[in-house]
């Protein structure tokens, strides 16, 4: 094959008058009788190829025989187009073909290769190699590649060492479920795929590699949603002899380079810092969207003595009353639309939603009759009311109130269009609690992980009241999504033991699971700290996508399966016997059903499409 001159999408006026060799896919063919136009597509874009009667009868026949998605080689001369297409990068020129070689024909694809398609997601994933030909996905995958390039360049410039950590490790029952890999050599024992390289990278600090980074593949067996996949990539870093500021400086430098190299945006540093308490009380979230205001306001002082028992009763029971004001919401939201929000926040355990409108100097709505003149003046002052606002209020336990208003705030912001487009707003959330209470588990868990260093006061509290301790941890948030998180790590055995004890570990369990770590901490372990950024989520947001699948070449669907290769799938009985696994009877019918379905699909495919002559 002859060497390609350039990508089809890069053939601009600078090539005018030159002979070129191009390769790509046929996007579209238009036969006008004496002229045939071919849109030739590759990863960089589309260029128009023209074949006319002067090109010869054979070339005209080849051009006329082409179908969409045929793979071709084109040779020809770059000439000016008679009519410029300003919508195309290549719109000033076209290629006057002298030779076309059909490298492979294509059957009619199950969906058209273009950005706007109506194909079902399952179909797109089954034919993912076709889906990935669409320009929007190619741009997203290329953007992800540019992020990776920037990461490698930055850490190399800063003297970090790229070290791979094991994929096959030991299972830990903490956190999400592990993906388990059975051992053939040790029947009944299992490896676990890593949920993160956390302990390995800490051990590397103990080994003296004071600046580590890795693009780490991680695995979590958890329920999926738009911003999660069972396998994902972390931009992982760890350093020795640095405090929080040092790690944050490196992180800001990395983000600055990514934003410049990938988005051509100059990120302003230092990035703003707010405490966890401020984030929760002002935004209702530890992942605050700081692109817009609509802050939460504490109305407890206004209503603590109110005759409206929904408010004063909640406060008396140790709860709070908070609210947000939606500008112009008085006209935009009818009673019916507001009541729909009541059902929405019940999922966050809120008992109800109180609301009032402020128009023409008057309050109206269900709770207006309970407002004293003093209440009204206080609300006007608290929210700086100008007129036209809708005020929504939740009274309940602090966590219920903040969760409910956080989600209402986000929903109102989207509905009223106050979120600025094309803005990437970063913020550090610092000074986290060391522990948080998990209602589902009914116990305290680590807010980040069990290896996070408490602050100085928190170290003392580990012995007396650990759940009041604060952590030396920090999250980097962008546009209301957590991009990454990190912390100062525990580097002394005594503190690590206290941490495990506070989490409810017995000494036996702690040493069975993490004895190697505690032994290491006694061997001259340095102070160390680190951070991990979710590459997939960062790429998704920079690409303007709503789902991580759009920045992942071969993702799983919402059921954690992969329709193209049919993974996961049953395996041969002998393979199971080799690793000492037997499928329980209750699952045998399901496995057999899956095997039969896959066999049938394979046979139908072979019967319909195969050229194999047995």
Curated annotation (Swiss-Prot):
GO terms for cellular component: cytoplasm. ATP binds at residues 220-222, 229, 482, 534-537. It catalyses: tRNA(Asp) + L-aspartate + ATP = L-aspartyl-tRNA(Asp) + AMP + diphosphate. CDD domains: AspRS_core, EcAspRS_like_N. It is found in: Cytoplasm. GO terms for biological process: aspartyl-tRNA aminoacylation. It holds the Pfam family tRNA-synt_2. Gene3D superfamilies: Bira Bifunctional Protein, Domain 2 (3.30.930.10), GAD-like domain (3.30.1360.30), Nucleic acid-binding proteins (2.40.50.140). It is an enzyme of class 6 (ligase). HAMAP family: Asp_tRNA_synth_type1. This is Aspartate--tRNA ligase. It comes from Lactobacillus johnsonii (strain CNCM I-12250 / La1 / NCC 533).
């Amino acid at each position: 094959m002859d060497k390609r001159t350039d990508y089809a999408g890069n053939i601009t006026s600078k090539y005018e008058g030159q002979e070129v060799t191009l390769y790509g896919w046929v996007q579209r063919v238009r036969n006008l009788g004496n002229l045939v136009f071919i849109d030739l597509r590759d990863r960089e874009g589309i260029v128009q190829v023209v074949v006319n009667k002067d090109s010869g009868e054979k070339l005209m026949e080849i051009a006329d025989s082409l179908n969409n998605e045929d793979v071709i080689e084109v040779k020809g001369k770059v000439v000016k187009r008679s009519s410029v297409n300003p919508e195309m990068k290549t719109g000033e020129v076209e290629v006057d073909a002298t030779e076309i070689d059909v490298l492979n024909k294509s059957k009619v694809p199950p969906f058209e290769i273009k950005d706007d398609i109506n194909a079902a997601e399952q179909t797109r994933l089954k034919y993912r190699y076709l889906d990935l030909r669409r320009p929007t996905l190619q741009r997203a995958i290329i953007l992800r590649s540019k992020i990776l390039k920037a990461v490698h360049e930055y850490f190399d410039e800063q003297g970090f060492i790229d070290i791979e950590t094991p994929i096959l490790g030991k299972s830990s029952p903490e956190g999400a479920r592990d993906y388990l890999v059975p051992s053939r050599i040790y029947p009944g024992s299992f490896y676990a795929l890593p949920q993160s390289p956390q302990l390995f990278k800490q051990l590397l600090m103990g080994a003296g590699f004071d600046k580590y980074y890795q693009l780490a593949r991680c695995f979590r067996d958890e329920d999926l949603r738009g911003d999660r996949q069972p396998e994902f990539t972390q931009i992982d870093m760890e350093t020795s002899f640095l405090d929080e500021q040092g790690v944050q400086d490196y992180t800001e430098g990395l983000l600055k380079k990514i934003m410049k190299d990938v988005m051509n945006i100059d990120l302003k540093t230092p990035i703003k810092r707010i405490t966890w308490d401020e984030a929760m009380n002002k935004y209702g979230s530890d992942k605050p969207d700081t692109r817009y205001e609509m802050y939460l306001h504490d109305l407890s002082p206004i209503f603590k003595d109110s005759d409206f028992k929904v408010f004063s009763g909640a406060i008396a029971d140790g709860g709070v009353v908070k609210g947000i004001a939606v500008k112009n919401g008085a006209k935009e939201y009818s009673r019916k639309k507001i009541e729909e929000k009541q059902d929405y926040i019940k999922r966050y355990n809120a008992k109800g939603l109180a609301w009032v409108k402020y128009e023409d100097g008057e309050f109206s709505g269900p709770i207006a009759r309970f407002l004293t003149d003093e209440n009204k003046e206080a609300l006007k002052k608290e929210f700086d009311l100008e007129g036209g606002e809708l005020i929504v209020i939740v009274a309940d336990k602090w966590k219920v109130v903040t969760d409910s208003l956080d989600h209402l705030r986000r929903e109102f912001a989207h509905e009223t269009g106050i979120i600025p487009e094309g803005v990437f707003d970063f913020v550090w959330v610092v000074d986290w609690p060391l522990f948080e209470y998990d209602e589902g588990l009914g116990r305290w868990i680590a807010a980040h992980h069990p290896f996070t260093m408490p602050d100085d006061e928190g170290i003392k509290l580990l012995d007396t009241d650990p759940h009041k301790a604060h952590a030396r941890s920090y999250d980097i948030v962008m546009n209301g999504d957590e991009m990454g998180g990190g912390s100062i790590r525990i580097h002394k055995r005594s503190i690590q033991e206290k941490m495990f004890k506070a989490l409810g570990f017995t000494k036996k369990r702690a040493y069975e699971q993490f004895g190697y770590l505690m032994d290491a901490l006694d061997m001259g372990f340095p102070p160390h700290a680190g951070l991990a950024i979710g590459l997939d989520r960062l790429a998704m947001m920079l690409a303007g996508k709503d789902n991580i699948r759009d920045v992942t070449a071969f993702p799983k669907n919402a059921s954690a399966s992969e329709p193209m290769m049919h993974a996961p799938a049953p395996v041969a009985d002998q393979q199971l016997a080799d690793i000492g696994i037997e499928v329980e009877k209750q699952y045998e019918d399901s496995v057999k059903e899956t095997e039969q379905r896959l066999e049938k699909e394979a046979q139908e495919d072979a019967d319909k499409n195969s050229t194999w002559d047995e």
